[in-house]
């Protein structure tokens, strides 16, 4: 799978309103809607609840390819769940397997990864399977067909757009669920802190006459483990005048940084306690804006970096 993302142009079809989307979705794919709605209504708890895979929607990239966005729902409010790749966590067709997370933060997390398919495979379903410790299997198909699921890159009512994210050069920036992958694999040792950094810029254009926008809408960056051996990481800060610590609402397992100027580099120190191959994810969003929310599938971007940890 090619994990190198690039900024996409706008889709050709306007975004549907939520109510209309639900009606169309019920007509177009009742089984998918019923399953995901049932999962949303399932009991929540502090621990020992399942994780459900979610199909968020699809993008027409305008170049003959389609990007399918996936997220998940961890019904635990305070417990991170880890499900390694394998029989309990896999994607079919197998060529797309490995893109999905193994580390599941609490609650609803939308658009954590995406896969891109060509036009001649548009009729295929991309299935994501998760199985809990009791052997219960949960699966969802990603498909780039139903108009009710089509997503877009148009500015929201007050101008919000997904922030750009990059590791080396802004010319290589990505955005949205597909985001961007770092070319280089970082290396460190168990117990030795390593700096993780990602740059971002919010390109939203908002009305300066609106009092809500007299000050910049900050970009929030959430660093978390995405894949890797079981176990938690320890986070610290290298110290940077361009970023602020925020408490956020991401729950355990994540480190949250605010960039008050809506651009800059978000840095954290990560210490790994087990050797192995890891992927770290940085989510950049502007959700403090009045028209930006994950529930509207806007406006955030993903950035991923591989880390190899030796003993």
Where are these regions (language model features)?
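Sec/Tat signal peptide C-region and signal peptidase I cleavage site
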Residues: 31-35
């Amino acid at each position: 799978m090619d994990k190198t993302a690039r900024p996409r142009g706008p889709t050709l079809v306007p975004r549907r309103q939520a109510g209309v989307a639900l009606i169309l979705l019920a007509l177009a794919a009742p089984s998918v809607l019923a399953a995901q709605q049932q999962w949303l209504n399932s009991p929540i708890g502090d621990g020992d609840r399942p994780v459900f895979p979610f199909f968020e929607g699809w993008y027409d990239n305008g170049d003959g390819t389609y990007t399918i966005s996936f997220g998940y729902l961890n019904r635990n409010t305070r417990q991170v769940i880890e499900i390694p790749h394998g029989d309990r966590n896999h994607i079919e067709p197998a060529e797309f397997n490995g893109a999905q997370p193994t580390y599941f933060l609490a609650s609803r997390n939308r658009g954590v990864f995406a896969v891109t398919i060509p036009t001649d495979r548009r009729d295929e379903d991309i299935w994501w399977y998760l199985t809990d410790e009791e052997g219960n299997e949960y699966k969802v198909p990603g498909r780039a067909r139903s108009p009710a699921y089509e997503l877009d890159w148009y500015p929201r009512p007050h101008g919000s757009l997904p922030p750009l994210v990059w590791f080396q050069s802004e010319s290589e920036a990505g955005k949205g669920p597909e985001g961007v992958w770092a070319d280089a694999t970082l290396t460190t040792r168990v117990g030795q802190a390593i700096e993780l950094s990602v740059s971002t810029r919010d390109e939203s254009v908002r009305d300066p006459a609106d009092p809500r926008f007299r000050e910049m809408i900050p970009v929030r960056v959430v660093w978390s483990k995405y894949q890797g051996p079981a176990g938690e990481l320890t986070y610290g800060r290298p110290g940077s005048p361009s970023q602020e610590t925020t408490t956020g609402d991401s729950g355990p397992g994540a480190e949250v940084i605010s960039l008050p100027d809506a651009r800059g580099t978000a840095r954290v120190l990560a210490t790994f306690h087990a050797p192995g191959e890891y992927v770290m994810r940085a989510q950049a969003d502007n959700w403090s804006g009045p028209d930006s929310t994950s529930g509207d599938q806007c406006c955030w971007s993903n950035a991923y970096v591989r880390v190899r940890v030796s003993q």
